[in-house]
Amino acid sequence: MSLSLFIARRIYRESDGGKQVSRPAVLIAMAGIAIGLAVMIIAVAVVIGFKSEVRNKVIGFGSHIQITNLDAVSSYETHPIVVGDSMMTALADYPEISHVQRFSTKPGMIKTDDAFQGMVLKGVGPEFDPRFIKEYLVEGEIPVFSDSVSTNQVLISKALATKMKLKLGDKIYTYYIQDDIRARRLTIAGIYQTNFSEYDNLFLLTDLNLVNRLNGWQPEQVTGVESVSYTHLTL
């Protein structure tokens, strides 16, 4: 006799008198087990889906790998690294890396007549991959980022726009503190919404040249390099 058949018979009949258990009781027990398993499967699927969504958004904002100055870890202001064409080419030659882009950041503050909010201005160049942010763009368009022509257009999150009472096309005043206070007026070209508050409440996306000028850096100096996606990389 197989083990499964033995267990089934023990469940179906009482061990003392061989009296058959009522069919409704068996059906109720089976239904309870089925519902319990279904709830467990759904819960696991939701958790896996949530983890995957969070992972994709973290990578979309930050990338799989970032190369930055070690001093930037313990400092409010970012410290640059020198990234020339040769370094970009060398990184792009790795078959495991599908995309490489430069970026620079500058912490600052948005101020309106009614409110102010801390933020980080992230600048990207012409090699910027717009696919992630385009997926979550709810208004406007993504500016064209170029090495030769600088722009003061910026992408802002819907959460920040709502909090600061801003809309598409508005001029916003941003302030930055280093040796002295610097102010820049930016134009809202697009509004995105990822519903990932850790990033939506923090990042504004703009031109790499603009951020480099705010930092007082040379053209080949940037905060870092990020690989937006890769299949496998052995360090």
Summary of predicted features, one role per range:
Residues M1-L37:
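N-terminal Sec/SRP start-transfer signal
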Residues G36-V47:
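Alpha-helical transmembrane segments
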Residues K51-G84:
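Membrane-interface junction motifs in transport/secretion proteins
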Residues Q66, Q153, G224-E226:
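Short aromatic/hydrophobic contact patches that present stacked aromatics
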Residues N69, S227-Y230:
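Short beta-strand-to-loop capping motifs
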Residues P80-I81, D85-E220:
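A structural signal for hydrophobic secondary-structure junctions
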Residues T231-L235:
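Conserved small/polar residues in nucleotide/adenosyl-binding loops
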